[in-house]
UniProtKB/Swiss-Prot annotation:
HAMAP family assigned to the protein according to its UniProt record, in alphabetical order: Arg_succ_synth_type2
Designated name of the protein: Argininosuccinate synthase
Binding site for ATP: A17, F18, S19, G20, G21, L22, D23, T24, S25, A43, G129, T131, D136, D194
Record has Hydrolase as a keyword: no
Subcellular location: Cytoplasm
Assembly information from the UniProt record: Homotetramer.
Taxon lineage: Bacteria, Pseudomonadati, Pseudomonadota, Betaproteobacteria, Burkholderiales
Family: Belongs to the argininosuccinate synthase family. Type 2 subfamily.
Enzyme class label: ligase
Length: 446
């Protein structure tokens, strides 16, 4: 039995993820006058460009919602964001600059918490503003059905009647005006923006062209660090972690993780830290481009990674990074709560994050230009005296190293044998600067 409804279910309760913007406002009112019983659910995700959440449900009632609820998702959003950080669940990067999966984390929280609220109200049909070409339509589909297996999906933007009657923003604005709401269409930007407390995404329109860059974006979580007229003073900040959790900034302890992340956003934002320009693969394997902001997560990640590399051994770090990339991809695909993701999360949080206790001091300059200037932890396995070139009490002697190097003869001989085989079958060509001719000579005894 299909879970997707292509036509408006007249006479039935329909929940809509309501942002208060033109699209969802017009959709809600249209559903009401066409005979559905709409319920509006608004997620408070701490969006930096939203200043009056309490007014949003009131507007929904005015537009025809039978009921409207504001769901505070901030604590859960930050909890999932810190979990992603602890696991390094970030698979998209360009030249070492990371995208922190802030939109996928937000969708995991919104998709579960709003559908749970709808279920409490006996609403088993859900609509949202995601389009059929994007990632969110699949993310919301998965998370919604995880919470409510009886859920049906109705999206106005997949309903041909809605598209025919209200196919664009100009038509929606006129529709609302004729209904007596005097809804003024906001000025069109050169790109679209989606944000939450963790970060902001700028994409589409002019940003679809790779000839348009970060300079056309007006940051909403920080400063335009590329502009010469923007003055940015260098700043030192100390971040403290306890058992993998960020607990203090500049010596100020935070019991509330939301408050800590807000302060981290302010600090990082003053420098434009955490902005990146990424080309990525959507779930459907088509490439898209986004410009991202995440000043607070970027600041915390610098400190967390520094402590991870100072505390854990090489093989643990390798597993942390490999599993983090795998987990990041699952998160991006809307599988944050799938068993394979939970297994990877549990491993990293238990065996990597729990050992991460300490402080890191960072000097921030412009954009992603920074220096680590101090690292302190009771759990450091970095011990300079082990490798000091000075005359100190060493943990091993020159003769110990001679023995260790002698044991390497076994695998070196193995490697030479394999190189001879590869050369004989033509897999390796001996060039003038290559050592392979010498290997051939050795075969003849010279």
């Amino acid at each position: 039995m299909t879970t997707i409804l292509e036509n408006l279910p007249a006479g039935q309760k329909v929940g809509i993820a309501f942002s208060g913007g033109l699209d969802t406002s017009a959709a809600l009112h249209w559903m009401r006058i066409k005979g559905a019983v709409p319920y509006a659910y608004t997620a408070n995700l701490g969006q930096p460009d939203e200043d009056d959440y309490d007014a949003i449900p009131k507007r929904a009632i005015q537009y025809g919602a039978e009921g409207a609820r504001l769901i505070d998702c901030r604590a859960q959003l930050v909890a999932e964001g810190i979990a992603a950080l602890q696991c390094g669940a970030f698979h998209i990067s360009t030249a070492g600059v990371t995208y922190f999966n802030t939109t996928p984390i937000g969708r995991a929280v919104t998709g579960t918490m709003l559908v749970a609220a709808m279920k409490e109200d006996g609403v088993n049909i859900w609509g949202d503003g995601s389009t059929y070409k994007g990632n969110d339509i699949e993310r919301f589909y998965r998370y919604g059905l995880l919470v409510n297996p009886d859920l049906k999906i109705y999206k106005p933007w997949l309903d041909q009647q809605f598209i025919d009657e209200l196919g664009g923003r100009a038509e929606m604005s006129e529709f609302m005006r004729q209904a007596g709401f005097e809804y003024k269409m906001s000025a069109e930007k050169a790109y679209s923006t989606d944000s939450n407390l963790l970060g902001a995404t700028h994409e589409a329109k002019d940003l679809e062209s790779l000839e348009s860059g970060i300079k056309i974006v007006n940051p909403i979580m920080g400063v335009a660090f590329w502009r010469d007229d923007v003055k940015i003073d260098k700043e030192e900040v100390t971040i403290r972690f306890e058992e993998g959790r960020p607990v203090a900034l500049n010596g100020v302890e935070y019991k509330d993780a939301v408050a800590l992340l807000l302060e981290a956003n302010r600090i990082g934002g003053r420098h434009g830290l955490g902005m990146s320009d990424q080309i990525e693969n959507r779930i459907i394997e088509a490439k898209s481009r986004g410009i991202y902001e995440a000043p607070g997560l970027a600041l915390l990640y610098i400190a967390y990674e520094r402590l991870v590399t100072g505390i854990h051994n090489e093989d643990t770090i390798e597993q942390y990074r490999e599993n983090g990339r795998r987990l990041g991809r699952l998160l991006y695909q809307g599988r944050w709560f799938d068993p394979q993701a939970i297994m990877l999360r549990e491993t990293a949080q238990r065996w990597v994050a729990r050992a991460v206790t300490g402080e890191v001091t960072v000097e921030l300059r412009r954009g992603n230009d920074y220096s680590i200037i101090g690292t302190r932890s009771p759990n450091l396995t970095y011990q300079p005296e082990r490798l000091s070139m000075e005359k100190v009490q060493s943990m091993f002697s020159p003769r110990d190293r001679i023995g260790q190097l002698t044991m390497r003869n076994l695998d070196i001989t193995d490697t030479r044998d394999k190189l001879r085989i590869y050369s004989q079958v033509g897999l390796l060509a001996a060039g003038e600067s290559s050592a392979l001719p010498k290997l051939k000579e050795d075969e003849s005894g010279n």
